[in-house]
A protein has these predicted regions:
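N-proximal low-complexity "stem/linker" segments adjacent to membrane-targeting elements
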Residues: 1-26
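Short beta-strand/loop segment that forms part of the nucleotide-sugar
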Residues: 11, 32-41, 57, 85
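Hydrophobic packing within well-folded, soluble alpha/beta domains
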Residues: 9, 20, 34-36, 45, ...
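A conserved acidic beta->alpha catalytic loop
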Residues: 26, 38-50, 61, 84
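Short, conserved active-site loop motifs that form the nucleotide-linked donor/cofactor pocket
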Residues: 7, 54-55, 109
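Catalytic-site signature of metal-activated, phosphate-bearing donor transferases
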Residues: 65-72, 78-79, 83, 90-254
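Conserved donor nucleotide-binding strand/loop of the catalytic core
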Residues: 32, 46-74
Length: 254
């Protein structure tokens, strides 16, 4: 690639020493600036990021949405590509982003939605619930994330949104146990968020929603076609769906 673009590559981190290098290396060919907002890593994350040429700043954890909003706002280029540390771009995606800028079409939208392919335990998921996922990651620095505890998304009010086929690769789990623990944490945050909004769950809600998830994603959308990997992934998520509604039902209001 001849030159970098008017683009800041932005990542939020905490203890991502085994992944941040790959992420930043994939951003470097297209980004004029690399920025990392770290929330207190006690491994080699910060050192690796600085060695990769990133500007590293510290911010105590504010929550997913606020942390991403702050990290994005500190970018010094007119465009931002926000990745998680467990994500990266391949060469083809770098070229597609470069082409979007070279054509001038980048200016026709405020936010660009990119496809994301999830890898689970070393294998790509080609079927099921996450096989055709899109995420809003290429934007102006003024993009804000909605203030929710989990599964944060950008505020697209008044934004012109486009689609670019520069795919983000996403390695979602280091191990099965780690992934289960992460989903358990998400379930607690989801239940807290819904409870604070005045929502409740009935006695059968957990079982019904988990069964519906399994039927829709593992059966109808073909998650079973990914073999053992597909079974493990969708079993984790069916359990996650069960847990979040069960927590919502069992935990009393404050």
């Amino acid at each position: 690639m001849a030159s970098t673009l008017p683009l800041s590559g932005v990542v939020i981190t905490r203890n991502e020493a085994d992944r941040i290098g790959r992420c930043l290396a994939s951003l470097a060919p297209v980004c004029t600036e690399l920025r990392v907002l770290d929330s207190g890593s006690d491994d080699e994350t910060v050192a690796i990021a600085r060695a990769a040429g990133a500007v590293v700043e510290h911010q105590d954890w504010l929550g997913f949405a606020a942390q991403k909003t702050l990290a994005t706002s500190r970018a010094r280029q007119p465009w931002v590509l926000l990745l998680d540390a467990d994500e990266w771009l391949d060469v083809q995606s770098q070229e597609r982003i470069a082409g979007l800028f070279a054509s001038g079409h980048i200016e026709s939208r405020d936010v660009w939605c990119l496809p994301r392919r999830t890898w689970f335990l070393g294998k790509p998921l080609r079927f099921g619930g996450w096989a055709h996922e899109y995420v809003h990651r290429l934007s102006r620095p003024d993009l804000r994330y909605l203030p929710v505890l989990v599964h944060e998304g950008p505020d697209l009010t008044g934004k012109r949104v486009g689609h670019c086929e520069a795919r983000i690769e996403h390695e979602t789990a280091r191990s099965l146990d780690e992934y289960r623990a992460k989903l358990a944490g998400y379930a607690r945050l989801w239940a807290q968020q819904r409870r604070e909004a005045g929502r409740r769950a009935g006695r059968m809600s957990a079982a019904v929603h988990a069964a519906a998830y399994w039927l829709k994603h593992y059966v109808i959308r073909g998650g079973f076609l990914d073999g053992r990997t597909g079974w493990q992934f969708h079993a984790c998520h069916a359990r996650y769906v069960y847990d979040k509604y069960d927590l919502l039902r069992r935990t009393p209001s404050a």
